[in-house]
Amino acid sequence: KENIIRGLIAGLFSTITIAALTLLTYKTQYGIFLMASFGSSMALLYGYPESPFVQPKNIFFGHLLSTICGMIFLFFFPLPIYITIPLAVGLAVSLMIMLDVSHPPAGGNPIIVIMGSVSLDYLINPVISGTIIILAFGIILNRLILKKKYPI
């Protein structure tokens, strides 16, 4: 029964957060606020807010660091994509662990960056702006509505 309630709440809060990012992306002129890996972040943030992987520093710096890793390979290593993607993901995972900012969903960011050939602006929108919005919703929904200690 606990998993059913946890699942329903996580689904509802994920819907609310992704809806806000989607509205900002498609109904304003402010840019892109969505990134595929944000969907995975929702599952952890709202399903398991006590996890060390979804604390604010992990979400923010995990997404930022892994995106930068993808950009390093995209912009500075003109190698075949089947070489750059694995190297960028491996570097991102290694650095997240070494710097204690592991956020598993962010491990996919280099794939998004390299396959999408994104510009440097991608760091601002969606990475930085999107993660700040996600963290704001995470704190508000977990603390104020669920009365959970987040961040821990």
Regions found by a protein language model. Name each.
Residues 50-58, 96-106:
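Membrane-helix interface "capping/anchor" motifs
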Residues 1-68, 72, 77-86, 117-152:
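Alpha-helical transmembrane segments and their membrane-interface boundaries
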Residues 34-37, 103-109:
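Transmembrane helix boundary and interhelical junction motifs in multipass membrane proteins
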Residues 93-98, 114, 139, 143:
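Mid-sequence acidic-hydrophobic segments that form the walls
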Residues 78-103:
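Internal alpha-helical transmembrane segments of multi-pass membrane proteins
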Residues 74, 108-115:
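Generic transmembrane alpha-helix signature in multi-pass membrane proteins
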